[in-house]
Amino acid sequence: MRIYLIGCMPEGKNSDLEERIMKILLAAVNAKYIHSNLAVYSLKAYAEDPAVEIGEYTINQQKDDILMDIYKRQPDILCLSCYIWNLDYIEEIVLEIGKLRPDMPIWLGGPEVSYDAKEVLRRLPCVKGVMKGEGEKTFKEICRIYRNEFEKRENVCGYQDKNVDNSWKKSESVDNQL
């Protein structure tokens, strides 16, 4: 399945329509370079979307190198997998990438953020939302929301985010049985 976003070029450039695939980056910050984050691979496989990319980093890398790599990839949406060994590190990266790309939605998931999503969203104002639970179905549906393929956002389960007016929206959990 290939999904295209159609948009008009800025006036004066080219009035023809341009097709562009929305890029979604699933980023994992591992404890060591020999470790691999299976969650991001599971999310990508379930989403069945060629526009989803995976970026794997380690807590031993310089934050600036990770920020540079994320910036060079130019994702439209950034999703990060949070665990006890990388949460502080990811929070620092998120705050910096939020300054570099304030228009880019940033989503977090994983056991270290899903139990108290409201506090995470309060602490990290540049984060759009937190995915809860297993995540596969929720991630796929959030991708569809951003592509305007999902008619009723209220039907998506397993996340908490901030509405446009910064009020809280909490969806019910979802059974993500594969």
Give, region by region, the residue ranges found by the protein language model:
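Short, Lys/Arg-enriched N-terminal segments with co-localized hydrophobic residues
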Residues: 3-21
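Glycine-rich beta-alpha loop elements in corrinoid/cobalamin-binding modules
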Residues: 5-10, 39, 43-46, 50-172
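A structure-centric signal for secondary-structure junctions around beta-strands
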Residues: 21-23, 37, 153
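Nucleotide-activated donor-dependent transferases that construct or modify glycoconjugates
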Residues: 23-32
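Short acidic-aromatic active-site loops that bind/stabilize oxyanions
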Residues: 32-33, 83
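Short N-terminal binding/cap micro-motifs at the start of the first secondary-structure element
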Residues: 33-39
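A short, charged helix-loop
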Residues: 172-178
